[in-house]
Design a protein with these regions (language model features):
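Short capping segments at the starts of secondary-structure elements
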Residues: 49-53
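Short, locally clustered residues in the helix-turn-helix/winged-helix DNA-binding domain
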Residues: 17, 44-48, 109
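N-terminal leader segment of winged-helix/HTH proteins
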Residues: 1-33
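Pre-recognition alpha-helix immediately N-terminal to the DNA-recognition helix
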Residues: 23, 41-44, 103, 107
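Charged, amphipathic alpha-helical coiled-coil/dimerization segments
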Residues: 73-143
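The alpha-helix within a helix-turn-helix
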Residues: 58
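Residues within helix-turn-helix
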Residues: 54-55, 66, 73, 93
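C-terminal regulatory/oligomerization modules of transcriptional regulators
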Residues: 1-4, 126-160
């Protein structure tokens, strides 16, 4: 059995993140999106889940409401989404994709599918299940740590 140094795992996770950002950054810029602001996730989630409130979308995309608001403004200006009064709560809006937004979201979905295939191509089912379980554990550890250190401004953004 090979003994893996813990620091090597951290380094590999960091490298994976860097390459992931580079790959997705290029892919999404090619179709006219800004990936660092969550635009692809917003479009994909609206395509998959349909119209929803800004807060529900922010929670689903794991974005604070300030970032979400600015990003929605940009996507609306680009003609990719619209905001309409929410009939069940007059103080909020329902965010939905326009026809152009659906087309762009389909492009995003294809990019994600290609990435999924690239991630899974080098592993069999058992390895994928083991990787999934391990990544869930790592995510859980970081999630717990993040909850302990969340800044007051983070909570303020989530309450809206």
């Amino acid at each position: 059995m090979i003994l893996v140094k813990k620091e090597e795992i951290r380094k590999i996770l960091f490298q994976v993140e860097l390459y992931r950002r580079k790959y997705f950054g290029h892919q999404f810029r090619t179709i006219g999106l800004t990936p660092g602001q969550g635009q692809p996730r917003i479009l994909k989630n609206l395509l998959d889940s349909g119209p929803m409130t800004q807060k529900a979308l922010a929670d689903l995309c794991m974005l604070d409401v300030t970032t979400m608001s600015r990003t929605l403004d940009r996507l609306e200006e680009a003609g990719l989404l619209s905001r309409k009064s929410n009939p069940s709560c007059r103080r909020s809006f329902l965010i939905s994709l326009t026809e152009a937004g659906v087309k762009k979201a389909e492009e995003v979905k294809a990019i994600f599918k290609e990435a999924d295939q690239m991630i899974c191509a080098c592993m069999d089912e058992d390895e994928l299940e083991m990787l999934y379980a391990s990544l869930c554990k790592i995510r859980g550890n970081f999630e717990q740590a993040a909850k302990k250190i969340s800044e007051p401004s983070d909570e303020k953004h989530r309450e809206k």
